[in-house]
Amino acid sequence: MAKLSLRNVQKTYAGNVKVVHGIDMEIADGEFIVIVGPSGCGKSTLLRMVAGLETITGGDIHIGDRVVNNLEPAERDIAMVFQNYALYPHMSVYDNMAYGLKIRGMAKAEIEQRVKHAAGILELAPLLDRKPRQLSGGQRQRVAMGRAIVREPSVFLFDEPLSNLDAKLRVQMRLELKELHRRLGTTSLYVTHDQVEAMTLADRMMVLNGGRVEQIGTPLEVYTRPASTFVAGFIGSPPMNLVPVARNGGMAGAGGVAQMRVLGKEGGASDATLGHLPMGLHLPAEALLGLRPEHIEPCAAHDAIAEVDVRVVEALGADSFAYGSLGGQPIVVRLDSHARVRAGDKLPVTSSPDHLHFFDAQSGKRIEA
């Protein structure tokens, strides 16, 4: 095992096309880091640079106490698990797992010990004589992970390993990956576009957008204190509501605290207000109020800070979601499954000041009080 350091890591292709912009991160020995972001954000490129499959055009990558920029993949003491399994179809499960060790000239007894140990961890022992075509998708992915485990690397690299699995199997494999990391404790870097994988697997996560880091933090930190409107909109399902707001003409409300007014779609003030601004918060001319759907609560009309015009209600079993508008702006409210809310209703809502997030509408950056 080893720590992993990314120091001003950059990638530029021919024609001065820059896809990774100076990424810095210190990954502790044994930490499980998830890089998450939309397609084309540079996450797989960054992983491939760590693996040695892409050249680095700026900065340094350290694995342990070595700078590995110019080392071949085989010299970096890493093991990689790919999206497409990459198993040899003519080989048995045992031989697929053992092949890399044989190439390295390891003793037969040591190979057998490592393969059987990994097979025991992954519950593959009864399948060692089978060919890949005789396995399910989840079993094939476990073989791919077993092939990485037997190498006993300093760092595991995972490139969207669950993307080819169906929804039910992805849940099962997430749990198995979490348990695997708990048992092995190997430093791991995991790439995904799936926020659920990121939230459930990560010790810390890096949110990438356009080759730049939007935020690094624990899943709870990223969810509860998003650093930008991009993070607020990307992490969470449904995502955070982002409502354009302004001071209510500079007028003070109760206790001398300014009120917020929702801005309509054309940028003009609507008739909707949203309670009072937190003390000490200074809004720029253009600001966005962020509210998670679960933090908007239906209430009695006299307690409401706003009223939502409900257009659609989706029932999902334990929860329901009301989709509607507030002052002409789209908004989503999470409801109890037993809530009697219908399309066409006007739903009075409230929210705790602790759950209000504010962002600069121009830069998208979080505004702190």
UniProtKB/Swiss-Prot annotation:
**Keyword Iron attached:** no
According to the UniProt entry, what is the EC number of this protein?
Answer: 7.6.2.10
Tell me the Gene3D superfamilies matching this sequence.
2.40.50.100, Nucleic acid-binding proteins (2.40.50.140), P-loop containing nucleotide triphosphate hydrolases (3.40.50.300)
- Short name of one Pfam family: TOBE_2
Q: What membrane topology does the annotation report for this chain? A: Peripheral membrane protein
> Catalysed reaction per UniProt?
sn-glycerol 3-phosphate(out) + ATP + H2O = sn-glycerol 3-phosphate(in) + ADP + phosphate + H(+)
Listed A to Z, the keywords are: ATP-binding, Cell inner membrane, Cell membrane, Membrane, Nucleotide-binding, Sugar transport, Translocase, Transport
Determine the domain of life of the protein's source.
Answer: Bacteria
Q: Quote the record's binding site residues for ATP.
A: G37, P38, S39, G40, C41, G42, K43, S44
GO biological process terms, semicolon-separated: carbohydrate transport; glycerophosphodiester transmembrane transport
InterPro entries cross-referenced by the UniProt entry:
AAA+_ATPase, ABC_transporter-like_ATP-bd, ABC_transporter-like_CS, ABC_transpr_MalK-like, ABC_transpr_MalK/UgpC-like, Mo/tungstate-bd_C_term_dom, NA-bd_OB-fold, P-loop_NTPase
GO molecular function ontology, one term from the record: ATP hydrolysis activity
Places the protein is found = Cell inner membrane
Boundaries of each ABC transporter domain copy?
A: 4-235
Q: Which cysteines are joined by disulfide bonds?
A: none
Q: Name one GO cellular component term.
A: ATP-binding cassette (ABC) transporter complex, substrate-binding subunit-containing
Record's function text: Part of the ABC transporter complex UgpBAEC involved in sn-glycerol-3-phosphate (G3P) import. Responsible for energy coupling to the transport system.
Q: To which protein family does this belong? A: Belongs to the ABC transporter superfamily. sn-glycerol-3-phosphate importer (TC 3.A.1.1.3) family.
Q: How does it assemble?
A: The complex is composed of two ATP-binding proteins (UgpC), two transmembrane proteins (UgpA and UgpE) and a solute-binding protein (UgpB).
* Name assigned to this protein: sn-glycerol-3-phosphate import ATP-binding protein UgpC
Gene name of the record: ugpC
